[in-house]
């Protein structure tokens, strides 16, 4: 579950690299059920979900690559989905960008005036999405006026000791607190801090063994302990309503 309930007070901006962000959102959705991957049209499955200290937000089923390794490394998982929130204004602008062809990633030829003031032109090739990135607000500059908070977590249903249980572990991060500490907004903070902790685990030899491994294949306890110490405290809810069948 990935909710950004913040407001950067821009008409349209992405919280990280626009090329990656827009391509990620406009690709087909993908989720896992009973050993099979199910593909959906982009953002076609959505429902309101309630996030701690935020309330209900429309949440959209998307493809996120961590699902692919989780179901491989935890073969007892029967179903896995990733949900992310988007505001209606963001989606309206995104539709406009797509309809105008500005989300294209193929090269187009453009007749551009020369910078020497001669009035002459030259044919150049540009990628529309890369051009769009150049004119959109820089994600690094959003933090100063960003308010609100993020809420990121996992909602899990299964059996423990023969009983049906639910479990919700989550972190909320306020954009202004992240900015005051690092000069960056909360989305960057919640991305960078876990990566830093992972590097720490590796450098200290806590997460180190021959071969190539995913994060979920290591002992989670020292990682979770560091999240609490490094500015991303987490909370647990046992046997609550997950709002998802």
Say what each PLM segment does.
Residues 1-245:
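C-terminal catalytic/substrate-binding lobe primarily of soluble NAD(P)-dependent oxidoreductases
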């Amino acid at each position: 579950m990935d909710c950004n309930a913040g407001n950067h007070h821009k008409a349209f901006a992405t919280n990280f690299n626009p090329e990656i962000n827009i391509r990620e959102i406009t690709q087909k959705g993908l989720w896992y059920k009973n050993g099979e991957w199910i593909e959906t049209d982009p953002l076609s499955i959505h429902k309101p979900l309630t996030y701690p200290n935020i309330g209900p937000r429309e949440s959209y089923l998307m493809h996120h690559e961590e699902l692919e390794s989780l179901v491989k490394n935890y073969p007892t998982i029967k179903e896995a989905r990733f949900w992310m929130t988007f505001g209606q204004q963001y989606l309206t602008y995104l539709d406009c960008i797509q309809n105008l062809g500005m989300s294209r990633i193929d090269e187009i030829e453009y007749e551009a005036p020369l910078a020497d003031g001669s009035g002459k032109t030259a044919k150049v090739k540009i990628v529309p999405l890369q051009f769009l990135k150049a004119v959109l607000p820089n994600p690094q500059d959003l933090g100063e006026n960003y308010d609100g908070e993020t809420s990121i977590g996992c909602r899990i249903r299964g059996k423990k000791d023969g009983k049906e249980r639910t479990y919700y572990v989550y972190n909320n991060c306020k954009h202004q607190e992240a900015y005051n500490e690092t000069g960056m907004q909360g989305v960057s903070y919640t991305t960078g801090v876990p990566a830093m902790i992972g590097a720490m685990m590796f450098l200290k030899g806590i997460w180190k063994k021959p071969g190539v491994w995913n994060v979920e294949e290591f002992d989670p306890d020292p990682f979770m302990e560091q999240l609490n110490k490094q500015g991303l405290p987490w909370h647990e809810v046992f046997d609550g309503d997950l709002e998802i069948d």
